[in-house]
Amino acid sequence: MKNIKKIATFALCALMTISGLGLTACGGGTKTGETEITVGILNNSSERENLKVLRNAFEKKYEAEGYKVKIVNLTGSYNEAVYRMHMAGQLPDVIQVFDDTSAYWTSKGIYADLDEYIARDNIDLSLYVDSMIDIARSGQGNDDSLYWLPRDYDKLVTYVNKDVFQAAGVEVPTAEEWTWAKMLEVCQALKDNEKKVLAANQEINVFYPMSFDPSWAPVYLTMFKNYNVELASNGKAFDGTEENIYACLNEMLSLQTKGYMSFGGNVNITTGELGLAVGGVRTGVPTYEMYDVNYEVLPFPSQINGNSYVACGAVGYGMTSSCSEDKKEIAWKFLSYMFSEEGQEEFSKSGAICPVMKSLLEKEDAEWKKYSKVDDTAFYAYPERDIKVTFLQDFQPVEQHTSIYNNYTYMFKDLYKDKYNGRQTVEAFYSHYSKQIEQEMK
């Protein structure tokens, strides 16, 4: 999902040529001092700042032992960086893990099984959000081991620009009444009052009620799950009745044909060009806070075709299989500290939103609650609705994961381009793309 196809294909194809050799054979990790471990993260400023906060707290806690953390930047795409560092024997002791590629790299033996450490230290996994624990069980089939520890709880939510609603004279709904039908009603009301919104904000010349990206995996997975359609299942791109498949496609398409949204347009909720925006927690909140948007957050709409599923995901850290024996204990202490209540609180000082520990979600004075000015209930409400975004986890061969993800992305981008991108009906559109995806699945 995050990776450019050209880069990802290079990395994955290269891995295919060595998969039979056993990926854990080479390695040995990056050379450091006896009490220093390396932690590899994506090479961007926000991740570096996040890790620095956690590193400083960890080093302070273990000052007597002299434990240190050296930050290693993963340059280029994640897949390319992991492959390149592994082949060079330069994998860090601990590495950042992303939900959408975790199954692939787990299958290649890059991440160490953490169950032994969890059992030894009597870590109670019931203290954490169930879906976050499930998503870190990134093995395939009956393998239910934890190969990494989730850092923060992320799911689809709905952001509301309150200034837009006020200008339009539309009341912001409550979380309890925020159903799919209510969302459509609100979008129509915002559309009907477009002139009021434009008149109230002289800095914009275009307005749409909402943004909703159907080509983003959490969105299309959520929509089809609510229509009782499984993706990439039983040899089918869409495993469900044609009636439900077409109904879901038509519902997503209607958001554009009714004028509720502009797909791919350069419009932004932070400027007031949008009234609503469907997005994740991790990247959304820091953006709205940075731009000082007068916003509110609602859950993802419920009661879509009678169901209320919503995709969730996570970023975390895992110990690499290349971590040397003399560093494993320090690496585990770092991971378990990040996962502890103390570590979650310290990490929240980076401005990260929504920890994975249940007790901190509703704790009024929890550190993470200091970094947004809104009612944060939507970030963790209704955990029973959660579905893992990693819908390809058990699909084999894992080498096909990236190309399959990409084909779903291209499909849903084309749904909003020139009305099925030259295909005359939803049925013809579906027939073309389902065959294309299923060809990738063979």
Tell me what each language-model feature is.
Residues 115-130, 175-177, 201, 226-247, ...:
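Short, solvent-exposed loop/beta-turn-alpha elements that line the ligand-binding surface or hinge
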Residues 267, 317-402:
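Mature extracytoplasmic/periplasmic domains
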Residues 187, 233-263, 300:
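Glycine-centered hinge/linker elements that transmit conformational signals in sensory
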Residues 99-156, 199, 296-301, 373, ...:
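Hinge/lid segment of periplasmic solute-binding proteins
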Residues 57, 61-131, 166-169, 270, ...:
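Extracytoplasmic "Venus flytrap"/periplasmic binding protein-like
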Residues 60, 65-68, 168, 257, ...:
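Extracytoplasmic/periplasmic substrate-recognition and gating elements
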Residues 141, 150, 375-436:
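C-terminal capping/gating helix-and-loop segments adjacent to ligand/active sites or protein-protein/ligand interfaces
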Residues 139-151, 156, 166, 181-236, ...:
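Extracytoplasmic/periplasmic solute-binding protein
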